[in-house]
Protein backbone atom coordinates (compact mmCIF):
# COMPACT_ATOMS: atom_id res chain seq x y z
CA UNK A 1 0.00 0.00 0.00
CA UNK A 2 2.85 2.35 0.92
CA UNK A 3 4.55 1.71 -2.47
CA UNK A 4 1.27 2.32 -4.29
CA UNK A 5 0.84 5.60 -2.42
CA UNK A 6 4.35 6.71 -3.42
CA UNK A 7 3.68 5.72 -7.06
CA UNK A 8 0.41 7.64 -7.17
CA UNK A 9 2.10 10.68 -5.61
CA UNK A 10 4.98 10.52 -8.11
CA UNK A 11 2.62 10.27 -11.08
CA UNK A 12 0.65 13.17 -9.70
CA UNK A 13 3.80 15.27 -9.36
CA UNK A 14 4.88 14.46 -12.92
CA UNK A 15 1.43 15.25 -14.24
CA UNK A 16 1.35 18.54 -12.33
CA UNK A 17 4.80 19.43 -13.65
CA UNK A 18 3.76 18.68 -17.22
CA UNK A 19 0.68 20.85 -16.74
CA UNK A 20 2.67 23.72 -15.25
CA UNK A 21 5.44 23.65 -17.86
CA UNK A 22 4.42 22.40 -21.29
CA UNK A 23 6.61 22.30 -24.40
CA UNK A 24 5.36 21.79 -27.95
CA UNK A 25 7.20 20.83 -31.12
CA UNK A 26 5.49 22.23 -34.22
CA UNK A 27 6.26 22.95 -37.83
CA UNK A 28 5.24 23.54 -41.43
CA UNK A 29 6.65 21.98 -44.60
CA UNK A 30 5.78 23.71 -47.89
CA UNK A 31 7.29 22.33 -51.09
CA UNK A 32 6.19 23.17 -54.61
CA UNK A 33 7.08 24.08 -58.18
CA UNK A 34 7.37 27.59 -59.60
CA UNK A 35 7.72 29.10 -63.05
CA UNK A 36 9.16 32.63 -63.17
CA UNK A 37 9.55 35.03 -66.09
CA UNK A 38 11.26 38.40 -65.60
CA UNK A 39 12.16 41.23 -67.94
CA UNK A 40 14.50 44.16 -67.24
CA UNK A 41 14.45 47.18 -69.55
CA UNK A 42 16.55 50.36 -69.49
CA UNK A 43 15.77 53.38 -71.68
CA UNK A 44 18.06 56.40 -72.01
CA UNK A 45 19.52 58.76 -74.61
CA UNK A 46 22.03 56.02 -75.40
CA UNK A 47 19.25 53.66 -76.47
CA UNK A 48 17.30 50.76 -75.04
CA UNK A 49 18.68 47.70 -73.29
CA UNK A 50 16.51 44.67 -72.53
CA UNK A 51 17.27 41.47 -70.66
CA UNK A 52 14.94 38.53 -70.06
CA UNK A 53 15.15 35.53 -67.78
CA UNK A 54 12.92 32.58 -67.04
CA UNK A 55 13.17 29.59 -64.73
CA UNK A 56 11.28 26.51 -63.59
CA UNK A 57 12.33 25.44 -60.11
CA UNK A 58 11.36 23.51 -57.02
CA UNK A 59 10.74 25.94 -54.19
CA UNK A 60 10.24 25.89 -50.44
CA UNK A 61 7.87 28.14 -48.52
CA UNK A 62 5.94 29.75 -51.37
CA UNK A 63 2.58 29.67 -49.60
CA UNK A 64 3.73 29.18 -46.01
CA UNK A 65 7.27 29.52 -44.70
CA UNK A 66 8.85 26.11 -44.09
CA UNK A 67 9.85 25.92 -40.45
CA UNK A 68 9.90 24.00 -37.20
CA UNK A 69 10.12 25.20 -33.66
CA UNK A 70 9.72 24.72 -29.95
CA UNK A 71 7.40 26.76 -27.78
CA UNK A 72 6.33 26.43 -24.21
CA UNK A 73 5.22 28.15 -21.05
CA UNK A 74 5.26 27.76 -17.30
CA UNK A 75 2.69 29.01 -14.82
CA UNK A 76 4.56 30.80 -12.03
CA UNK A 77 1.45 31.43 -9.99
CA UNK A 78 -0.07 34.71 -8.86
CA UNK A 79 -1.24 35.36 -12.42
CA UNK A 80 2.28 35.27 -13.93
CA UNK A 81 3.46 33.09 -16.80
CA UNK A 82 6.80 32.78 -18.54
CA UNK A 83 7.07 31.47 -22.08
CA UNK A 84 9.52 30.99 -24.93
CA UNK A 85 9.57 30.42 -28.67
CA UNK A 86 12.48 29.09 -30.73
CA UNK A 87 11.72 28.85 -34.46
CA UNK A 88 13.99 27.66 -37.25
CA UNK A 89 13.50 28.36 -40.94
CA UNK A 90 14.85 25.97 -43.56
CA UNK A 91 14.44 25.06 -47.23
CA UNK A 92 12.50 21.84 -47.69
CA UNK A 93 13.76 21.47 -51.28
CA UNK A 94 17.44 21.40 -50.25
CA UNK A 95 17.50 21.07 -46.47
CA UNK A 96 19.52 24.28 -46.21
CA UNK A 97 19.41 26.33 -43.03
CA UNK A 98 17.49 29.60 -43.33
CA UNK A 99 19.33 32.91 -42.83
CA UNK A 100 22.42 30.97 -41.61
CA UNK A 101 20.89 30.91 -38.11
CA UNK A 102 19.67 28.06 -35.94
CA UNK A 103 16.62 30.03 -34.84
CA UNK A 104 16.50 32.79 -37.44
CA UNK A 105 12.72 33.16 -37.49
CA UNK A 106 12.32 33.74 -33.77
CA UNK A 107 14.23 33.31 -30.52
CA UNK A 108 12.27 34.97 -27.74
CA UNK A 109 11.24 34.76 -24.12
CA UNK A 110 8.16 36.40 -22.64
CA UNK A 111 6.52 37.22 -19.33
CA UNK A 112 2.76 37.73 -19.13
CA UNK A 113 0.25 38.76 -16.51
CA UNK A 114 -2.60 41.15 -15.87
CA UNK A 115 -0.36 43.93 -17.21
CA UNK A 116 -0.05 42.29 -20.63
CA UNK A 117 2.93 40.50 -22.18
CA UNK A 118 6.55 41.60 -22.56
CA UNK A 119 8.74 39.84 -25.16
CA UNK A 120 12.53 39.96 -25.60
CA UNK A 121 14.81 38.51 -28.28
CA UNK A 122 14.76 38.15 -32.05
CA UNK A 123 11.24 38.31 -33.48
CA UNK A 124 8.98 39.66 -36.21
CA UNK A 125 8.19 43.35 -36.35
CA UNK A 126 4.67 44.52 -35.50
CA UNK A 127 4.06 45.35 -39.17
CA UNK A 128 4.68 41.74 -40.23
CA UNK A 129 2.43 38.68 -40.17
CA UNK A 130 5.04 36.46 -38.52
CA UNK A 131 5.90 35.19 -35.09
CA UNK A 132 4.48 36.04 -31.70
CA UNK A 133 3.78 39.74 -32.21
CA UNK A 134 3.38 40.43 -35.96
CA UNK A 135 -0.28 41.47 -35.94
CA UNK A 136 -0.58 43.96 -38.81
CA UNK A 137 0.21 41.88 -41.90
CA UNK A 138 -2.57 39.34 -41.42
CA UNK A 139 -5.23 42.07 -41.44
CA UNK A 140 -3.65 44.04 -44.30
CA UNK A 141 -3.89 41.49 -47.13
CA UNK A 142 -5.47 38.16 -48.02
CA UNK A 143 -1.94 37.11 -49.08
CA UNK A 144 -0.29 38.37 -45.89
CA UNK A 145 3.23 39.45 -46.75
CA UNK A 146 2.99 37.55 -50.05
CA UNK A 147 3.55 34.07 -51.47
CA UNK A 148 6.55 34.75 -53.71
CA UNK A 149 8.41 37.64 -55.34
CA UNK A 150 5.65 38.12 -57.91
CA UNK A 151 2.62 36.55 -56.16
CA UNK A 152 2.79 39.52 -53.88
CA UNK A 153 0.88 40.83 -50.91
CA UNK A 154 0.64 44.37 -49.61
CA UNK A 155 4.34 44.59 -48.69
CA UNK A 156 5.34 44.85 -52.36
CA UNK A 157 3.75 48.31 -52.56
CA UNK A 158 4.84 49.37 -49.07
CA UNK A 159 8.23 50.64 -47.90
CA UNK A 160 11.04 49.47 -45.61
CA UNK A 161 9.63 46.04 -44.84
CA UNK A 162 12.12 43.94 -42.88
CA UNK A 163 10.15 41.08 -41.37
CA UNK A 164 12.40 40.40 -38.36
CA UNK A 165 14.92 42.21 -36.21
CA UNK A 166 17.47 41.39 -33.52
CA UNK A 167 17.54 42.48 -29.87
CA UNK A 168 13.87 43.44 -29.74
CA UNK A 169 11.68 44.45 -26.81
CA UNK A 170 7.91 44.27 -27.42
CA UNK A 171 4.92 45.04 -25.21
CA UNK A 172 1.41 43.76 -25.96
CA UNK A 173 -1.43 45.03 -23.78
CA UNK A 174 -4.38 43.02 -22.52
CA UNK A 175 -7.42 43.30 -24.76
CA UNK A 176 -10.02 45.83 -23.66
CA UNK A 177 -13.23 46.68 -25.52
CA UNK A 178 -11.87 44.75 -28.51
CA UNK A 179 -8.67 46.84 -28.57
CA UNK A 180 -5.06 45.69 -28.16
CA UNK A 181 -2.08 48.08 -27.96
CA UNK A 182 1.47 47.33 -29.10
CA UNK A 183 4.90 48.93 -28.64
CA UNK A 184 8.26 47.72 -29.96
CA UNK A 185 11.91 48.77 -29.91
CA UNK A 186 14.79 47.03 -31.72
CA UNK A 187 18.32 47.86 -30.61
CA UNK A 188 19.97 46.74 -33.84
CA UNK A 189 22.39 43.90 -34.41
CA UNK A 190 26.07 43.53 -33.66
CA UNK A 191 28.33 43.18 -36.70
CA UNK A 192 31.80 44.27 -37.82
CA UNK A 193 30.79 47.92 -38.21
CA UNK A 194 27.73 48.36 -36.00
CA UNK A 195 27.19 47.95 -32.25
CA UNK A 196 23.90 47.16 -30.54
CA UNK A 197 21.95 50.21 -29.37
CA UNK A 198 24.63 52.64 -30.59
CA UNK A 199 24.56 55.16 -33.43
CA UNK A 200 26.54 52.77 -35.65
CA UNK A 201 23.55 50.38 -35.76
CA UNK A 202 20.16 50.80 -37.43
CA UNK A 203 17.57 51.00 -34.64
CA UNK A 204 13.83 50.59 -34.99
CA UNK A 205 10.71 51.54 -33.03
CA UNK A 206 6.97 51.08 -33.60
CA UNK A 207 3.65 51.64 -31.87
CA UNK A 208 0.35 50.21 -33.02
CA UNK A 209 -3.20 49.28 -32.13
CA UNK A 210 -5.73 46.69 -33.26
CA UNK A 211 -9.50 46.73 -32.82
CA UNK A 212 -11.91 43.91 -33.63
CA UNK A 213 -15.67 44.02 -33.43
CA UNK A 214 -18.16 41.82 -35.25
CA UNK A 215 -17.20 41.51 -38.93
CA UNK A 216 -14.72 44.42 -38.72
CA UNK A 217 -11.03 44.46 -37.87
CA UNK A 218 -8.91 47.62 -38.00
CA UNK A 219 -5.22 48.21 -37.31
CA UNK A 220 -3.01 51.29 -37.22
CA UNK A 221 0.75 51.47 -36.86
CA UNK A 222 3.55 54.02 -37.00
CA UNK A 223 7.17 52.90 -37.20
CA UNK A 224 10.48 54.71 -37.37
CA UNK A 225 14.01 53.75 -38.31
CA UNK A 226 16.96 55.56 -36.79
CA UNK A 227 19.61 54.89 -39.43
CA UNK A 228 23.23 54.37 -38.51
CA UNK A 229 25.80 57.13 -38.89
CA UNK A 230 28.61 54.85 -40.03
CA UNK A 231 30.70 55.73 -43.07
CA UNK A 232 29.40 55.22 -46.60
CA UNK A 233 31.87 53.24 -48.72
CA UNK A 234 31.32 52.60 -52.43
CA UNK A 235 33.83 50.81 -54.67
CA UNK A 236 36.21 50.69 -51.67
CA UNK A 237 36.13 54.51 -51.48
CA UNK A 238 34.83 56.12 -48.29
CA UNK A 239 32.83 59.25 -49.03
CA UNK A 240 33.97 62.32 -47.07
CA UNK A 241 31.70 63.37 -44.22
CA UNK A 242 29.67 66.42 -45.15
CA UNK A 243 29.32 65.33 -48.78
CA UNK A 244 26.20 63.29 -48.03
CA UNK A 245 23.40 62.97 -45.50
CA UNK A 246 21.60 59.99 -43.99
CA UNK A 247 17.89 60.49 -43.44
CA UNK A 248 15.88 58.65 -40.78
CA UNK A 249 12.71 57.03 -42.11
CA UNK A 250 9.18 56.56 -40.86
CA UNK A 251 5.95 55.03 -42.12
CA UNK A 252 2.29 55.53 -41.19
CA UNK A 253 0.11 52.46 -41.78
CA UNK A 254 -3.63 51.84 -41.70
CA UNK A 255 -5.35 48.55 -42.54
CA UNK A 256 -8.71 46.92 -42.08
CA UNK A 257 -10.86 44.01 -43.11
CA UNK A 258 -14.58 43.32 -43.36
CA UNK A 259 -16.13 39.85 -43.40
CA UNK A 260 -19.54 39.98 -45.09
CA UNK A 261 -20.08 36.24 -44.78
CA UNK A 262 -19.34 35.02 -48.29
CA UNK A 263 -16.12 37.07 -48.67
CA UNK A 264 -13.56 38.90 -46.55
CA UNK A 265 -12.16 42.12 -48.02
CA UNK A 266 -8.88 43.77 -46.96
CA UNK A 267 -7.55 47.29 -47.50
CA UNK A 268 -4.06 48.54 -46.58
CA UNK A 269 -2.70 52.09 -46.88
CA UNK A 270 0.75 53.47 -46.15
CA UNK A 271 2.51 56.83 -46.22
CA UNK A 272 6.31 56.61 -46.11
CA UNK A 273 8.93 59.32 -45.64
CA UNK A 274 12.64 58.99 -46.54
CA UNK A 275 12.39 55.21 -46.96
CA UNK A 276 15.29 53.25 -48.46
CA UNK A 277 13.86 49.94 -49.60
CA UNK A 278 10.79 50.54 -51.78
CA UNK A 279 9.26 47.85 -54.04
CA UNK A 280 12.29 45.63 -53.55
CA UNK A 281 14.81 48.12 -54.97
CA UNK A 282 17.67 46.90 -52.78
CA UNK A 283 17.52 43.27 -54.02
CA UNK A 284 17.27 44.45 -57.64
CA UNK A 285 20.13 46.92 -57.23
CA UNK A 286 22.17 44.23 -55.50
CA UNK A 287 21.85 41.94 -58.51
CA UNK A 288 23.51 44.63 -60.65
CA UNK A 289 26.20 46.24 -58.47
CA UNK A 290 26.73 43.59 -55.79
CA UNK A 291 25.16 43.27 -52.34
CA UNK A 292 27.63 45.46 -50.44
CA UNK A 293 27.70 48.43 -52.85
CA UNK A 294 23.93 48.26 -53.41
CA UNK A 295 23.27 48.60 -49.70
CA UNK A 296 25.65 51.57 -49.49
CA UNK A 297 24.12 53.37 -52.48
CA UNK A 298 20.61 52.78 -51.17
CA UNK A 299 21.54 54.42 -47.86
CA UNK A 300 21.82 57.70 -49.79
CA UNK A 301 18.67 57.19 -51.89
CA UNK A 302 15.40 57.90 -50.09
CA UNK A 303 11.82 57.76 -51.30
CA UNK A 304 8.74 59.59 -50.03
CA UNK A 305 5.29 58.51 -51.16
CA UNK A 306 2.37 56.18 -50.56
CA UNK A 307 1.11 52.67 -51.25
CA UNK A 308 -2.34 51.07 -51.37
CA UNK A 309 -3.38 47.40 -51.59
CA UNK A 310 -6.86 45.90 -51.97
CA UNK A 311 -7.56 42.17 -51.67
CA UNK A 312 -10.30 39.65 -50.95
CA UNK A 313 -10.73 36.03 -49.91
CA UNK A 314 -13.77 33.83 -50.55
CA UNK A 315 -14.75 30.16 -50.75
CA UNK A 316 -15.65 28.49 -54.06
CA UNK A 317 -15.12 25.14 -55.81
CA UNK A 318 -14.46 23.43 -52.49
CA UNK A 319 -11.53 25.65 -51.56
CA UNK A 320 -10.47 29.18 -50.69
CA UNK A 321 -9.68 31.83 -53.31
CA UNK A 322 -7.59 34.97 -52.88
CA UNK A 323 -7.14 37.95 -55.19
CA UNK A 324 -5.35 41.27 -54.75
CA UNK A 325 -4.10 44.39 -56.52
CA UNK A 326 -1.70 47.09 -55.35
CA UNK A 327 -0.13 50.39 -56.40
CA UNK A 328 2.73 52.51 -55.06
CA UNK A 329 4.01 55.97 -56.05
CA UNK A 330 7.01 57.80 -54.63
CA UNK A 331 9.51 60.59 -55.27
CA UNK A 332 13.18 59.70 -54.90
CA UNK A 333 16.07 61.89 -53.72
CA UNK A 334 19.79 61.14 -53.71
CA UNK A 335 21.44 62.85 -50.73
CA UNK A 336 24.95 63.31 -52.12
CA UNK A 337 26.57 66.67 -52.90
CA UNK A 338 27.83 65.57 -56.32
CA UNK A 339 24.36 64.54 -57.48
CA UNK A 340 22.45 67.78 -56.96
CA UNK A 341 19.67 68.05 -59.50
CA UNK A 342 18.83 64.36 -59.27
CA UNK A 343 15.10 63.64 -59.51
CA UNK A 344 13.47 60.26 -59.43
CA UNK A 345 9.95 58.89 -59.65
CA UNK A 346 9.18 55.35 -58.54
CA UNK A 347 6.03 53.38 -59.25
CA UNK A 348 5.07 49.78 -58.52
CA UNK A 349 2.09 47.63 -59.48
CA UNK A 350 1.01 44.14 -58.45
CA UNK A 351 -1.86 41.75 -59.19
CA UNK A 352 -2.19 38.25 -57.73
CA UNK A 353 -4.65 35.37 -57.51
CA UNK A 354 -4.39 32.19 -55.45
CA UNK A 355 -6.33 29.04 -54.58
CA UNK A 356 -6.02 26.72 -51.56
CA UNK A 357 -7.71 23.32 -51.18
CA UNK A 358 -7.66 21.49 -47.84
CA UNK A 359 -7.02 17.74 -47.95
CA UNK A 360 -7.30 17.48 -44.15
CA UNK A 361 -7.02 19.70 -41.10
CA UNK A 362 -3.24 19.76 -41.46
CA UNK A 363 -2.59 19.33 -45.19
CA UNK A 364 -3.53 21.42 -48.21
CA UNK A 365 -2.55 22.02 -51.81
CA UNK A 366 -2.34 25.43 -53.45
CA UNK A 367 -1.77 27.19 -56.73
CA UNK A 368 -1.42 30.82 -57.69
CA UNK A 369 -0.07 33.35 -60.15
CA UNK A 370 1.01 36.95 -59.89
CA UNK A 371 2.40 39.89 -61.85
CA UNK A 372 4.56 42.75 -60.59
CA UNK A 373 6.04 45.82 -62.24
CA UNK A 374 8.54 48.37 -60.94
CA UNK A 375 9.37 51.64 -62.69
CA UNK A 376 12.17 54.06 -61.81
CA UNK A 377 12.26 57.24 -63.89
CA UNK A 378 15.41 59.30 -63.15
CA UNK A 379 16.64 62.69 -64.34
CA UNK A 380 20.18 63.88 -63.64
CA UNK A 381 22.44 66.37 -65.44
CA UNK A 382 19.69 66.95 -68.04
CA UNK A 383 19.70 63.25 -68.90
CA UNK A 384 16.73 60.96 -68.46
CA UNK A 385 16.77 57.23 -67.79
CA UNK A 386 13.88 54.87 -67.13
CA UNK A 387 14.30 51.39 -65.68
CA UNK A 388 11.41 48.92 -65.73
CA UNK A 389 11.32 45.48 -64.13
CA UNK A 390 8.41 43.13 -64.87
CA UNK A 391 7.89 39.76 -63.24
CA UNK A 392 5.43 36.87 -63.45
CA UNK A 393 5.16 33.77 -61.23
CA UNK A 394 3.03 30.66 -61.50
CA UNK A 395 3.31 28.29 -58.55
CA UNK A 396 1.74 25.16 -57.08
CA UNK A 397 2.59 23.08 -54.06
CA UNK A 398 1.65 21.18 -50.93
CA UNK A 399 1.67 22.34 -47.31
CA UNK A 400 1.70 20.01 -44.29
CA UNK A 401 1.54 21.22 -40.69
CA UNK A 402 2.53 19.25 -37.61
Positions of PLM-derived features:
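Outer-membrane beta-barrel architecture
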Residues: 10, 69-71, 108-110, 170-172, ...
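Transmembrane beta-barrel strands of outer-membrane/channel proteins
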Residues: 29-35, 84-88, 122, 183-187, ...
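Residues that define the transmembrane beta-barrel architecture of outer-membrane proteins
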Residues: 52-66, 102-105, 163-167, 201-205, ...
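Repeated loop/turn-to-beta-strand initiation elements of outer-membrane beta-barrel proteins
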Residues: 80-82, 115-119, 178-181, 215-220, ...
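Detector for outer-membrane/organellar transmembrane beta-barrel domains
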Residues: 207-352
